[in-house]
Amino acid sequence: MESGGKTNRQLRKAICVSTDEKMKKKRSPSVIVIGGGMAGISAARTLQDASFQVVVLESRDRIGGRVHTDYSFGFPVDLGASWLHGVCKENPLAAVIGRLGLPLYRTSGDNSVLYDHDLESYALFDKAGNQVSQELVTKVGENFEHILEEICKVRDEQDEDMSIAQAFSIVFKRNPELRLEGLAHNVLQWYLCRMEGWFAADAETISAKCWDQEELLPGGHGLMVRGYRPVINTLSKGLDIRLSHRITKISRRYSGVKVTTEKGDTFVADAAVIALPLGVLKSGMITFEPKLPQWKQEAINDLGVGIENKIILNFDNVFWPNVEFLGVVAETSYGCSYFLNLHKATSHPVLVYMPAGQLARDIEKKSDEAAANFAFSQLQKILPDASSPINYLVSRWGSDINSLGSYSYDIVNKPHDLYERLRVPLDNLFFAGEATSSSYPGSVHGAYSTGVLAAEDCRMRVLERYGELEHEMEEEAPASVPLLISRM
């Protein structure tokens, strides 16, 4: 996938078109794809399959972006995305996963109050290590769903938006019977903690108007048992990918696009697909020439970027209950904890601590060792005899210069159509990524589908410009292979 020592001159020759060649009607159009995550790889795959000359420029020393499967434990664990949200044939990634025969472990069915988990296999504890009864957890869950229903009524009555936290306060004032005390209050805060984890953001910043605008595919949610790496590797096979190429400038002209890297290398093509994380676009690290129009820049500025991290603890034996997840309830959502039990799905003795929002930001200030110790201290609150982990992994999506956040979400007082505004092409620049998916933001299949869509838009626009619409894309209908789903 790397350049194999090609010189910059050779690279230009590979993707640039001379004046004489432009006169040839049958030449292959050229596209630069900026970003080698799921969106960028799916865009490049689609364009190359349509006989376009494509080069992918990726700032990291690996492909995948926020899809990152690590093998240092001797088996795969995902530091980034790990779920397929919507285990069904309608999911655009289902065909790829099915053809590869990759197993999924279903953690929830449709319409679960916990989004990616059902209340079937869990253990919640208070900070003293006492397990919370299933009856109370179920009762508080029903209360939480009732609160969300009341929030929808509150927001529909008002023109102005508000945060989920503000909406909670209004609901409690109107319906004091929904306000809980003692242990029940702490369990309610744990439900709120899991809602914050879904959006990778704090309730004080999540829009009450837009929190439920994404489309949830049927079939529930499935963990990728072998990780997402096989998917990204398959899609990237045969692509010209240049790693460690950080972009600093994107210049658009009528005749084409010129991209400049921090090392001073330049790449020229007919068009470019920009498949960069929203956090990177927000940072201003990349200069656009000419500047992006106000409507496009506002879309970048006004979408929220959340943070959810993973602290993955690997043990030499299993000492915890045989449930899908463990949790610690507390007086505030910030003080609650959530551990995903990978042993249930993969048979490996691994627990994954997953902080989000401000808690994730605070933990990112710690060293890897301190972060792992913090996660283990949360585990010791509920399992005081827990053995120490033999090794650990820590993600830092918020401070990673290549991501600067985990995924997008709707913030207060900003419209949901910002996703679509970010997606809309700008001359010969096309945009892809989970933050351009109004239906499936924050998901791998959302990123994948926007990459395909950007590639199709790019193909049509470029071929129209060169009068080559007869150069049709060869489509192969993927064989429908059933997904391998388990639930132990």
Curated annotation (Swiss-Prot):
Q: Which cofactor does it need?
A: FAD
Q: Name one GO cellular component term.
A: peroxisome
Q: Which gene encodes it?
A: PAO3
Mind telling me which Gene3D superfamilies this protein's record contains?
A: 3.90.660.10, FAD/NAD(P)-binding domain
Name the cystine pairs: none
Q: Which family does it belong to?
A: Belongs to the flavin monoamine oxidase family.
Q: Which UniProt keywords apply?
A: FAD, Flavoprotein, Oxidoreductase, Peroxisome
Q: How is the cofactor bound?
A: Binds 1 FAD per subunit.
Q: In which pathway does it act?
A: Amine and polyamine degradation; spermine degradation; Amine and polyamine degradation; spermidine degradation
Tell me what the record says about temperature and activity.
Answer: Optimum temperature is 37 degrees Celsius.
Q: What class of enzyme is it?
A: oxidoreductase
Domain of life per record:
Eukaryota
By its UniProt entry, which SUPFAM superfamilies does this protein fall under?
Answer: FAD-linked reductases, C-terminal domain (SSF54373), FAD/NAD(P)-binding domain (SSF51905)
Its lineage reads: Eukaryota, Viridiplantae, Streptophyta, Embryophyta, Tracheophyta
Q: What is this protein called?
A: Polyamine oxidase 3
Organism, scientific name? Arabidopsis thaliana
